[in-house]
Amino acid sequence: MAQKERGERDERDGEFVDRLVHINRVAKVVKGGRRFGFAALVVVGDQKGRVGFGHGKAREVPEAVRKATEAAKRGMIYVPLRSGRTLHHDLEGRHGAGRVLLRSASAGTGIIAGGPMRAIFETLGMQDVVAKSLGSSNPYNMVRATFDALKHQMHPRDIAVQRGIKYSILQARRQHLVDAEG
């Protein structure tokens, strides 16, 4: 595999949207004093259901962001969206002391989420969602907890297969519940 020259861009770069979530200045104590560096947390998505996050460390901010972006592209996941705009069902995710609750929302609700979660939903292409962060407000824990929840998102067809029932029956039950709420 040939190495890419510095400054060359991958052809797929145009289809991804990236958001810088957090930059942290870190220090390493050495004999001559402190040596400073930077750690960056970046979220990358195609706004069509694929999203990933990455962590990069370097002596300079742009290099840390570049490394984080590359890591995010390597670790992307696919999240099935209902009508291309919201979740199929409510979710809960955990990581460390961080806990997030994600709820599907009706059309026109928008993204109601704080901090790092908003960046994830925007890059994912989600338009309507309500999210609540409980516990740790550390951006790393919030991002990982959100990804934990999104990994457990299942399409209703997969749920129907697991339960051994027809998709149309599951869909009819859901519509009955929606009509009862309305």
UniProtKB/Swiss-Prot annotation:
Keyword list, A-Z: Ribonucleoprotein, Ribosomal protein, RNA-binding, rRNA-binding
NADP as UniProt keyword: no
Entry-linked PROSITE patterns: RIBOSOMAL_S5, S5_DSRBD
Cellular component, GO annotation: small ribosomal subunit
InterPro entries in the record: Ribosomal_Su5_D2-typ_SF, Ribosomal_uS5, Ribosomal_uS5_bac-type, Ribosomal_uS5_C, Ribosomal_uS5_N, Ribosomal_uS5_N_CS, Ribsml_uS5_D2-typ_fold_subgr
Pfam families noted in UniProt: Ribosomal_S5 (PF00333), Ribosomal_S5_C (PF03719)
Biological process, per Gene Ontology: translation
Domain S5 DRBM: 16-79
Superkingdom: Bacteria
Signal peptide residue numbers: none
One GO molecular-function entry: rRNA binding
Protein family (similarity comment): Belongs to the universal ribosomal protein uS5 family.
UniProt domain comment: The N-terminal domain interacts with the head of the 30S subunit; the C-terminal domain interacts with the body and contacts protein S4. The interaction surface between S4 and S5 is involved in control of translational fidelity.
UniProt subunit comment: Part of the 30S ribosomal subunit. Contacts proteins S4 and S8.
Function: With S4 and S12 plays an important role in translational accuracy.
Full protein name: Small ribosomal subunit protein uS5
UniProt organism field: Bartonella quintana (strain Toulouse) (Rochalimaea quintana)
